[in-house]
Structure formats: C-alpha cells, structure tokens
Amino acid sequence: MHTFIEPLILYAVLFLRVSTVAALSGEAVEFSAVAETVRIVLYNIPSLALIWYLLLKVKSLKEWGITLPGKRDLLPAAAALPALMLIGLTISIVSRFFTEVPSGSQFLPPQNFVSWSILVISCISTAYLEESFFRFYLLSKREEMGLSPFRAVLVSTALFSVCHIYEGPWGFLNAALSGILLAFLFLRYRSLHGIASAHALYNVLVYALSAV
C-alpha cells in the first residue's frame, strides 16, 4: 500500500483540484494572456520540476528508458496526432445528436500574436506535465505498485479523465479515449516526447480550428 502513497499525494496536490477558472456548462471563456502566463510560471513549471525531481532522484533518464527528443519519437507522434484528432472529431459530431447532454465550457481562441505565442507555450508545458505524470510516471512505476500493464492503463486513464471532468461529459469521454490511446502508445514505444508533442499540437489545433 505504501507504494501508492507518493502517486496519490502527487495527484491530489497537482491535479485533483476544483478549477477556479472553469465556467458554467456551455459558457464561453475568453483567453487571458496574463492568467495563462501566471499558470505556466506558478503551476506548470513547478509541477513538472517536482515530478521530474522525484523520478530522477531514483533513476537517471537512461535508466528510465527516456532519451532526448529524436527520430524515435516521430512514429509515436505520427500515430498519436491523427488518432487524437479522430477521437475529438467523432465526439464533436456525435455530441450534436445528444443536445440534452450538457456541454462543457467553450474556451475561446487568442486574438493576437503574443497571446497565440503564450498559448503554444502553455499547450507544450501542459502536455509535458500531463504526459510526465499520467503516462511516464504512473506507467513506469506500475511494477512497483504491483499493477499489470492493462490495470496500469486503466488507473492512468481514470485519473486523467477525472481531471477533465470540468469539460463536461463529452470532455470526460474525450479524455478517457485519448488517455487509453496515449498510454498504450507510451507502453509500446517508450516515447515521452512523441506523445507529448502530439498532445500539445492537438490542443493547439483545437484552438486554431475554433478560430476559423
């Protein structure tokens, strides 16, 4: 049981929180460059630093099986991005036939170059934060926690989905399906950078498409 203490504390402190910026169901939320910058500096970066400190305190990157970004990350990234887009598009289409199901908050795209630049940095840092914990950290520690690969994927996906519950039922479903995909790709290719880059680019594309 003690092997679950650190992951649970990390999850509770870093992810299991009530978002103070989440709007009511269906409400539009304007992009704030200042608020996003504050979130990057005071939340994303310190959270990433904590996760990696705990990981590197035990093993080196090489021992964890993680290398610097390279060609080996291209295949998982190329597999993840279109699959994430397909999941998002399918849910978007299906949700239109179930108007009685409440929708999540609508996050509006940035309006200028500076704001878009901040958004890109935010998407990259957020993707690396989520992939570092939900895929790299949890799945790498599955043996220590006595979990089979399949059960580890379920645990990782469940925790990841709960963090997106503020996006409504469809956002929760999107996170669940995407979480399963990213978890299996990480287990198959052991590529943190591949899935993180696909995750980040997907989030940027969602904003870009909403601006069209």
What are these regions (language model features)?
Residues 88-91, 106-162:
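Function-critical hydrophobic alpha-helical transmembrane segments in multi-pass membrane proteins
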Residues 74-79, 116-120, 150-155, 172-173, ...:
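Hydrophobic alpha-helical transmembrane segments
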Residues 1-58:
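Alpha-helical transmembrane segments in multi-pass membrane proteins
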Residues 162-170:
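Membrane-interface helix caps and helix-loop-helix hairpins in membrane proteins
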Residues 18, 48-51, 58, 87, ...:
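Alpha-helical transmembrane segments of polytopic integral membrane proteins
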